[in-house]
Regions:
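Helix-loop-helix
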Residues: 55-61, 66-67, 160-174, 248-317, ...
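An intracellular "coupling" helix at the cytosolic face of ABC transporter transmembrane type-1 domains
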Residues: 23, 114-115, 131-140, 144, ...
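ABC-type nucleotide-binding domain
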Residues: 332, 338-587
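Juxtamembrane loop-to-helix connectors within ABC transporter transmembrane domains
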Residues: 9-10, 18, 86, 90-94, ...
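Hydrophobic alpha-helical transmembrane segments of ABC transporter permease domains
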Residues: 30, 38-42, 82, 130-175, ...
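Alpha-helical transmembrane segments of multi-pass membrane proteins
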Residues: 30-31, 75-94, 145-152, 173-197, ...
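Short intracellular "coupling" helices and adjacent cytoplasmic loop segments at the cytosolic face
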Residues: 2-4, 95, 102-127, 131-133, ...
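Transmembrane helix-loop-helix hairpins at lipid-water interfaces of multipass membrane proteins
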Residues: 25-82, 162-167, 278-282
């Protein structure tokens, strides 16, 4: 995510978001043009009054003064209407673009492989979806508007002033590109500092998220002071980054102030000289002073917006960084939709290594599971049990070999169709913030309330749900914090019951539960497994004694397979694992 993009590339990628808002943008720029012209006309009126009064005070008639007053009022009315549109509709356009970008980035993230979430901190991802895009609203509105206003003021004032005195005008305007050059160089440093600042905000978000989610662990170890120290360290680092940014911003302001002084000095010295020799008059001098003030105010306004612009550009850059992340698991053009799935699964010489590692987790693994068969996979930690459960729904792509469902390579099946036919119950249950009903119906969005009730009953969750104050409408808190471990697991099982998939993966589904909860959940899982092809990743080996077949996975591959009785009679690896597991449970 650390690729560097040029400004031109960022603008090229960002411009399409103006697409459906071009009418709004054009009208916004027209209003900006009217507002700018109103500002440019006032100095001309004052120049006319000054020269007229200097020439002959009798020419300043009441009619002339009233006429100029009416013109000024009309200009102010036009300016007010134009500014209302710019401030109201223009800002809404920026918010609409921000909304479109947030929709696109969230949709894109949903399509990224499971590996993306394992290699990127959730705080960083969250920061890019939310905080980074907040500043795009102002950027999308003010960037074209302020640039357009600056161009109009430069061009129109140049045309007007060049017709008054060529030398003085060129002397002043030749400083502008020099000023832009120096300001651009400091601008690049500001953007780098701004990007580093955003990255660190993501780190802080990740730290805060970890602290909040791990609040129970923090308090159980009485490590509140340690957490505060860790946060303080990161917070001070953020302050250092802000200091660096403001140092570059101060350099930016210094450049502006230097050229501000030089341009005023030029008008005062050279303008006074030309007045003395009769090349310009007092009205012209007044006009030059007002226009120079206007031009410098335009530059100053851009300077004032520069931090905002940098935040917007950084937000766009970090947005594009995620949008450029490619999904390495995509459907083929002719990918199939699974129908009438029996549930036969076959691993053919499957090898797998994680994307950021050359070490193979699985090496040349082959086995088959027949329709409706209940297969258990056991082994010590780190041999690849959970990896197998992640490969079947294609959360990761196999490095070598193939996985077949009903004789079809899963790479030839549409991912949605594949996963629609697989139910997964994990050790770490994730329940969404919301009600019990909302969490169960997540398994099948078009399910009726009766279907949800039936699923809850089959999962052994119905009785405890009905004891809750709001029953199915009970709010369960963030990640189901208001429920016990066993209750959360039964809700997740009900979700799979509702989905009713032909293939079921149980990834250490009861290993984190106490004995009482495990017994209840195990009973629900046995009901759930009936008639389905079931792969059980087991930690507590006593729960898989009734499996059709047990595969013993080691670093050398599948070293043993058979029923519980067959493997116990062999007195091999499984025999030792089982007895060790029983001894641990007794302790």
């Amino acid at each position: 995510m650390q690729k560097t993009y040029t400004n031109s590339y960022l603008f090229k990628r960002f411009l399409p978001y103006y697409g459906k808002y071009y009418p709004t943008l054009i009208l916004d720029l027209i209003c900006a043009g009217f507002s700018t012209m109103c500002d440019l006309v006032l100095p001309i009126i004052l120049r006319y009054l000054t020269n007229t009064a200097r020439q002959d005070l009798s020419l300043l008639t009441v009619k002339l003064i009233l006429t100029l007053g009416v013109i000024f009022v009309l200009l102010r009315v036009v300016d007010t209407i134009a500014n209302y549109y710019m401030q109201n509709i223009g800002h809404v356009m920026g918010a609409q673009i921000e909304t479109d970008m947030r929709y696109d980035i969230f949709s894109h993230i949903q399509q990224l492989p499971y590996s993306y979430y394992n290699t990127n901190k959730s705080g960083q991802i969250l920061s890019r979806i939310t905080t980074d895009l907040f500043d795009v609203t102002e950027f999308a509105h003010h960037c074209p508007e302020e640039f357009f206003i600056a161009v109009v003021k430069l061009v129109v004032s140049f045309v007007i002033l060049i017709n008054i005195n060529i030398t003085l005008t060129l002397t002043i305007f030749i400083m502008i590109p020099i000023m832009v050059f120096f300001m651009s160089s400091t601008n690049n440093h500001m953007r780098k500092a701004q990007k580093e600042q955003r990255n660190h905000v993501g780190e802080i978000n990740s730290g805060i998220e970890n602290n909040i989610l791990g609040a129970k662990v923090v308090k159980s170890f009485a490590n509140e002071e340690l957490e505060v120290k860790k946060f303080h360290k990161e917070n001070l680092r953020f302050l250092d980054i802000k200091r660096e940014f403001y140092k570059h911003m101060s350099n930016f302001q210094v450049v502006y102030r230097i050229f501000d002084g030089i341009m005023y000095l030029t008008v005062i010295v050279l303008g006074s000289y030309y007045m003395k020799v009769g090349k310009i008059n007092a009205g012209d001098m007044f006009l030059y002073t007002l226009y120079i003030n206007m031009l410098l105010n335009t530059v100053k306004k851009i300077v004032d917006y520069m931090e905002q612009f940098q935040r917007g550009m950084t937000g766009i850059e970090r947005f594009i960084e995620i949008m450029d992340v490619k999904n390495d698991i995509v459907d083929k053009e002719n990918a199939k939709v699974l129908t009438d799935v029996s549930g036969d699964i076959e691993f053919e010489n499957v090898s797998f290594a994680y994307p950021d590692s050359d070490a193979k987790v699985l090496d040349d693994i082959s086995f088959s599971i027949n329709k409706g068969e209940n297969i258990a996979i056991v082994g010590s930690s780190g041999v690849g049990k959970t990896t197998i459960s992640n490969l079947i729904p294609r959360f990761y792509e196999v490095t070598e070999g193939a996985i077949l469902i009903d004789g079809t390579d899963i790479r030839d099946i549409k991912q949605k169709s594949l996963r629609d036919n697989i139910g997964i119950v994990q050790q770490e249950v994730y329940l969404f913030s919301g009600t019990i009903y909302e969490n169960i119906v997540y398994g099948k969005k078009n399910a009726s309330f009766e279907d949800v009730e039936k699923a809850a009953k089959m999962a052994g969750a119905y009785d405890f749900i009905m004891e809750l104050p709001d029953k199915f409408d009970t709010y369960i808190g963030e990640r189901g914090t208001k429920l016990s471990g066993g209750q959360k697991q039964r809700i997740s099982i009900a979700r799979v019951f509702l989905k009713n998939p032909p293939i079921l993966i149980l990834d250490e589904a009861t290993s984190a539960l106490d004995n009482n909860s495990e017994a209840i959940v195990q009973q629900s899982l046995e009901i759930l497994s009936k008639g389905r092809t079931t792969i059980t990743i087991a930690h507590r080996l006593s729960t898989i004694r009734n499996a059709s077949k047990i595969l013993v996975l080691t670093e050398n591959g599948i070293e043993e397979s058979g029923t519980h009785e067959e493997l116990m009679n062999k007195e091999g690896i499984y025999f030792n694992l089982y007895n060790k597991n029983i001894d641990e449970l007794k302790e």
